[in-house]
């Protein structure tokens, strides 16, 4: 099986999701052909048992799309796993991947929890929900919760 994981940053300063990806790759990479796609970082975490690919950022969306399309055609993954929310690049990548016929797993990593949804709701969350986030959650082939409480809160949203 071939899996591509996308994470916006593998930088040591980027927090829990990068640390999660480091631990996941170390073990999952023993079982499957694992590729991790991210963006260039000054201080990236060491990744084992996977191939790391850096693509252009959303500052260069056409180049990012071109690089993603190339990677997808080269790797031919069975699934693409997007690990993020609230970042437009995540929604664009998911759309591009699904438009090419690949299955997508979306893991919000707690970013759709009620307390986070309430934070900056009117200025950040609501516009993002309107423009891309709700559609991304609805279009995901699989929505992956990292805890039972997150699963319950995702089900309450009713998006997927």
Which ranges hold each PLM region?
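A short, charged, and often flexible helix/loop element on the N-terminal side
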Residues: 45-75, 79-88, 119-125
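Membrane-proximal helix-turn-helix segments that form the acceptor-binding/catalytic region
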Residues: 112, 125-143
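A short, active-site helix/loop in glycosyltransferases that binds the activated sugar's phosphate group
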Residues: 136-160
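Generic beta-sheet signal
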Residues: 6, 37, 55, 107-108, ...
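Short glycine-rich, flexible loops that bind phosphorylated cofactors or substrates
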Residues: 12, 87-89, 152
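Anion (oxyanion) recognition and catalysis
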Residues: 28-29, 98, 137
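An aromatic- and histidine-rich active-site surface loop
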Residues: 79-114
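N-terminal subdomain of nucleotide-sugar transferases
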Residues: 1-43, 48-51, 75
